[in-house]
């Protein structure tokens, strides 16, 4: 088959196939996504997200775009920070994840605008948001460079991008982490979500994602300044921050 190639986990696929394959994964895991996050990370994902929210330094009335917002953890935190006079958009390219997130927020009494949106072609005007966030979503995007440029475009001058993502763990822990990721994680997926294959992909996608320094350079290439990152849990995840000047 012709066309440009990209990776889907450890597999090589045509670029125009990847989005559909990623969609299948998240349609499958959406209903069990929150409980699997708690089990897989032993609850640490809540600590990582809390740190991300505290890093933002939002003020009342700010506008926030939560890309690949999934079940709404960050959107909820952003909404509390910007208040009723602010604006928080929950977006995701996957309709199943977006529905779970919207319904979960509604059950908590939060009515936020939602959009089924592709991060590589955001349906928002230039220079609009004070903050753009993407948590555990960038690694699933086919053209990460295009997505980062779109995030830059919709930010106001002085606005901030926060990227929370799995990254490169400290080397002494690689062996144990690989055993957990490739042996235990698919088993947990099968037992809890009845879906070992999707969680095998998630483990592989983490390994294929750019490391801390590579992602930092990608953000600089997209136009961001003052780019830096903070490792958490020995580098299992990293929070990258960049500013649009």
UniProtKB/Swiss-Prot annotation:
Positions annotated to bind S-adenosyl-L-methionine: 71, 92, 118-119
Broad class of enzyme this protein falls into: transferase
Name listed for the protein in its UniProt record: Ubiquinone/menaquinone biosynthesis C-methyltransferase UbiE
Family: Belongs to the class I-like SAM-binding methyltransferase superfamily. MenG/UbiE family.
Protein's job: Methyltransferase required for the conversion of demethylmenaquinol (DMKH2) to menaquinol (MKH2) and the conversion of 2-polyprenyl-6-methoxy-1,4-benzoquinol (DDMQH2) to 2-polyprenyl-3-methyl-6-methoxy-1,4-benzoquinol (DMQH2).
Pathway assignment: Quinol/quinone metabolism; menaquinone biosynthesis; menaquinol from 1,4-dihydroxy-2-naphthoate: step 2/2; Cofactor biosynthesis; ubiquinone biosynthesis
Enzyme Commission number(s) of this protein: 2.1.1.163, 2.1.1.201
Native source organism of the sequence: Neisseria meningitidis serogroup B (strain ATCC BAA-335 / MC58)
Keywords from the UniProt entry: Menaquinone biosynthesis, Methyltransferase, S-adenosyl-L-methionine, Transferase, Ubiquinone biosynthesis
Recorded GO MF terms: 2-methoxy-6-polyprenyl-1,4-benzoquinol methyltransferase activity; demethylmenaquinone methyltransferase activity
Biological processes per GO annotation: aerobic respiration; menaquinone biosynthetic process; methylation; ubiquinone biosynthetic process
């Amino acid at each position: 088959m012709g066309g440009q190639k990209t990776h889907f986990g450890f597999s090589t696929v045509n670029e125009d196939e990847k989005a559909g394959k990623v969609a299948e994964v998240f349609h499958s895991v959406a209903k069990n996504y929150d409980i699997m996050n708690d089990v897989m990370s032993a609850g640490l994902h809540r600590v990582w997200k809390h740190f991300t929210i505290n890093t933002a330094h939002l003020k009342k009335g700010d506008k926030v775009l939560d890309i690949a917002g999934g079940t709404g953890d960050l959107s909820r935190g952003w909404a509390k920070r910007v208040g009723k006079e602010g604006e928080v958009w929950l977006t995701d390219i996957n309709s199943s994840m977006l529905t779970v997130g919207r319904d979960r927020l509604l059950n908590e009494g939060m009515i936020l605008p939602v959009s089924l949106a592709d991060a590589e072609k955001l349906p928002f005007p230039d220079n609009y948001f004070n903050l753009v966030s993407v948590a555990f979503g960038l690694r699933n995007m086919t053209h990460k460079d295009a997505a980062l440029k779109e995030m830059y475009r919709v930010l106001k001058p002085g606005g901030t991008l926060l990227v929370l993502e799995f990254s490169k763990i400290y080397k002494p822990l690689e062996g144990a982490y690989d055993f957990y990721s490739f042996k235990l994680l698919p088993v947990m997926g099968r037992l809890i979500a009845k879906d070992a294959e999707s969680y095998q992909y998630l483990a592989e996608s983490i390994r294929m994602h750019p490391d801390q320094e590579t992602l930092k350079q990608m953000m600089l290439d997209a136009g961001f300044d003052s780019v830096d990152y903070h490792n958490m849990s020995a580098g299992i995840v990293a929070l990258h921050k960049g500013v649009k000047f």
